[in-house]
């Protein structure tokens, strides 16, 4: 079924630590040109109640903002909890240290509508801790995603917009500490090979890189290897075998 014009969107964000980037991130969502959304914020971890207290003023200023607390610190738990709180069938991801450009939701939603997609990401602009531009990254389009995904994550997680039922059919996020998103995409690919997903080439989010980023950690590669091994044991295809071998080699090199 095609999406209806003027569908409401649920934007989900987990806040594990309140810092100088959180307000910038929230404001970038509240100032979107597409205004028909709710913003679900999960204050998670040991400081969740203090974080929620610091964010409470947003609920008083804008009734689209809803804040919930979760004492479990792992991101995958927070995102699953956020999904259960979403009222609408379309969900957009957002991280608490990134910046969505003003047209992000509008452009993603319209592209999703026009192409009858179930999930869509965008390109990103890498920025450093001071907000200074580093470079642009663009991701594979729909014709290449299924071929590349077993070997490499084809989506920038905080840029994604997807139909809620796509995530629920896979029982949500089940991943580890560094690559819960990649785990989910692999499960979707293997269970729903005809999934309609794509990436906009336009960069619609500023993605902040920190000195302690998990992007290049060995643990992340080992997690990816374990996901590939699981998929190979479920479906013993050449692609899944090569994917498993590739990720284990990457982990060993790291």
UniProtKB/Swiss-Prot annotation:
EC id: 2.4.1.122
Keyword Transferase attributed: yes
Disulfide-linked positions: none
Catalyzed reactions: an N-acetyl-alpha-D-galactosaminyl derivative + UDP-alpha-D-galactose = a beta-D-galactosyl-(1->3)-N-acetyl-alpha-D-galactosaminyl derivative + UDP + H(+); alpha-D-GalNAc-(1->3)-alpha-D-GalNAc-di-trans,octa-cis-undecaprenyl diphosphate + UDP-alpha-D-galactose = beta-D-Gal-(1->3)-alpha-D-GalNAc-(1->3)-alpha-D-GalNAc-di-trans,octa-cis-undecaprenyl diphosphate + UDP + H(+)
A GO molecular-function descriptor: glycoprotein-N-acetylgalactosamine 3-beta-galactosyltransferase activity
Family: Belongs to the glycosyltransferase 2 family.
Function: Involved in the assembly of the O-repeating unit during O-antigen biosynthesis.
Full protein name: O-antigen biosynthesis glycosyltransferase WbnJ
Organism per entry: Escherichia coli
Organism lineage string: Bacteria, Pseudomonadati, Pseudomonadota, Gammaproteobacteria, Enterobacterales
């Amino acid at each position: 079924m095609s999406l209806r014009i003027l569908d409401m969107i649920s934007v989900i964000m987990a806040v594990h630590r309140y810092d100088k980037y959180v307000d910038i991130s929230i404001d970038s969502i509240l100032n979107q040109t597409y205004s028909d959304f709710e913003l679900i914020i999960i204050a998670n971890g040991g400081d969740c109640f203090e974080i929620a207290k610091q964010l409470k003023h947003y609920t008083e200023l804008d009734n689209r903002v809803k804040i919930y607390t979760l004492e479990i610190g792992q991101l995958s738990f927070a995102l699953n909890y956020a999904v259960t709180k979403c009222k609408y069938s379309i969900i957009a991801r957002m991280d608490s240290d990134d910046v969505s450009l003003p047209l992000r939701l509008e452009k993603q939603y319209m592209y999703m509508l026009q192409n009858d997609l179930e999930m869509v990401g965008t390109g990103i602009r890498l920025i450093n801790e001071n907000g200074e531009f580093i470079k642009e990254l663009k991701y594979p389009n729909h014709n290449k995603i299924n071929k590349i995904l077993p070997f490499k994550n084809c989506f920038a997680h905080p840029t994604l917009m997807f139909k809620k039922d796509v995530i629920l059919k896979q029982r949500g996020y089940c991943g580890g500490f560094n690559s819960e998103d990649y785990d989910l995409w692999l499960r979707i690919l293997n269970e729903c090979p005809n999934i309609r997903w794509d990436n906009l080439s336009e960069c619609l989010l500023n993605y902040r890189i920190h000195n302690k980023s998990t992007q290049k950690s060995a643990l992340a590669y080992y997690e990816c290897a374990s996901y590939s091994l699981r998929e190979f044991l479920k479906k013993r295809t050449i692609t899944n075998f090569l994917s498993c071998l590739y990720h284990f080699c990457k982990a060993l090199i790291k």
